[in-house]
């Protein structure tokens, strides 16, 4: 689900009435025997926030918590975590040309890194489980960052564990082996955890290869009076948004929701 209550409802997420609401009033009026309908409240005041830039970043790989060590893969729940993201880390054997990484299964969205460089993603929605990885030296660091995107709460898929649910295998030179010897980092989605991160001046949101740098980005802006507004993240990728410590919602470049609705207090 998107972070929104606007499922084509008669009243929008921001509290404004829609044409559907007007049609409903017209229909109901036919059966009210001339009784007067209640007055529609005025729209909630909105404000415009001038464009602002993010000035600080806490890179993910420089701000990891203490890991847990495990020989084999386990789910997020088995590491006492119910939501957020989780990072699985191990080392790779020497890969002369290329190899195929198979993750069974990543719930729900996995980003793959080798020695800190983004290689690709595995999206559960699309049934993606395999990724080709390039040649690398023995001991190269493999990171699999898995985000839990919400739980299925009906039907046969209700048993919906998060993280990597079974195993990770590498097909290298015609031989398939299960990767073992993992360090596991719990990355819970709690604002208290973000406050302790080490931020540094933001020079670019992309690395030398043009890939977005995973991490926590921070900006400061001021409003003169309280009001409702929408924060536009159309040029960003995938992540979570907090304002003054309050979780506003998820953003994702694929849509359908390019903006996040929020109420701002003067500060």
Could you say what each language-model-derived stretch is?
Residues 127-131, 219, 258-260:
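Short strand-edge motifs at loop-to-beta-strand transitions and within beta-strands
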């Amino acid at each position: 689900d998107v972070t929104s209550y606007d499922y084509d409802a008669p009243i929008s997420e921001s509290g404004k009435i829609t044409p559907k609401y007007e049609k409903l009033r017209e229909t109901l009026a036919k059966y009210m025997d001339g009784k007067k309908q209640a007055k529609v409240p005025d729209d909630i005041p909105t404000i415009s926030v001038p464009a602002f830039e993010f000035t600080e970043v806490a890179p993910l790989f420089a701000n990891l918590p203490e890991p847990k060590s495990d020989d084999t893969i386990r789910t997020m729940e088995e590491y006492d975590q119910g939501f957020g993201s989780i990072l699985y880390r191990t080392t790779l054997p020497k890969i002369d040309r290329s190899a195929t990484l198979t993750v069974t299964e990543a719930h729900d969205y996995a980003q793959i890194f080798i020695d800190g460089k983004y290689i690709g993603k595995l999206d559960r929605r699309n049934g993606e489980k395999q990724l080709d990885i390039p040649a690398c030296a023995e001991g190269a660091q493999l990171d699999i960052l898995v985000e839990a995107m919400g739980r299925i709460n009906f039907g046969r898929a209700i048993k919906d564990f998060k993280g990597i649910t079974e195993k990770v295998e590498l097909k290298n030179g015609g031989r398939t082996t299960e990767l073992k010897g993992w360090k596991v980092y719990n990355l819970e989605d709690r604002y208290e955890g973000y406050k302790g991160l080490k931020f540094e001046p933001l020079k670019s949101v992309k690395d030398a290869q043009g890939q977005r740098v995973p991490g926590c980005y921070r900006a400061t802006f001021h409003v003169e009076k309280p009001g409702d507004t929408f924060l536009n993240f159309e040029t960003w990728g995938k992540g979570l948004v907090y304002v003054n410590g309050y979780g506003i919602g998820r953003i994702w470049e694929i849509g359908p929701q390019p903006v996040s609705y929020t109420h701002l207090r003067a500060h």
